[in-house]
Amino acid sequence: MTIPTSRGKRTTFFHLIRFFIFFLTCFNGGEANCGSGCGLALASYYVWQGCNLSYISNIFGREIPEIVQYNPGIHNSDSISSDIRINVPFSCDCINGDFLGHTFEYETVAGDTYRKIATSAFANLTDEYWLNRVNRFRPNDIPDRVPINVTVNCSCGDGSVSEDYGLFLTYPLRRGQNLSSVAEECGVPANLLRRFNPGADFAAGSGIVFVPAKG
């Protein structure tokens, strides 16, 4: 689905989106001035009550068997527990030469707001501020069944920290977590997490960090 404007207007709108995302990345600690992406990243998606794999598959554009491949704990793809995290693969691109991420096209439903899309549909993998800046609708007046752009940051790692990891998880922090709990949950040394995320506050209860995974 495309935005119903002329080709020239679509191109202008596209470049405005890229500019705003780059601007926001500079002020939000994203990885800037990339040369290339790394093909694959994982999103740590917190499954909310009533969510299922069909929904997750649809918004990320990935087939269910591909998602299950990265989640050995899922034994029944027709039914998954809520209040757990699952890993969702997505391509980690160098967007406009500026930063690493991937822009998904999400089709709105009745009652959507930027806050709801960020916190529920995309499980805090992005935030309301970003969505508001790179899309043209008012935050609480979004039409039904229109495409909006949702950008999720990713990481290809840092060779100066370690070259042992080629796959990284975009991990939204939740209330009650800290460096030790994230390290224990993900099976990664706390010191390594800190080095891959300099300046990150793991106890903030919000925001994202990048967790190395073998790949």
Where are these regions (language model features)?
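Primarily a LysM-type cell-wall glycan-binding module
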Residues: E31-E63, F90-D127, C156-L192
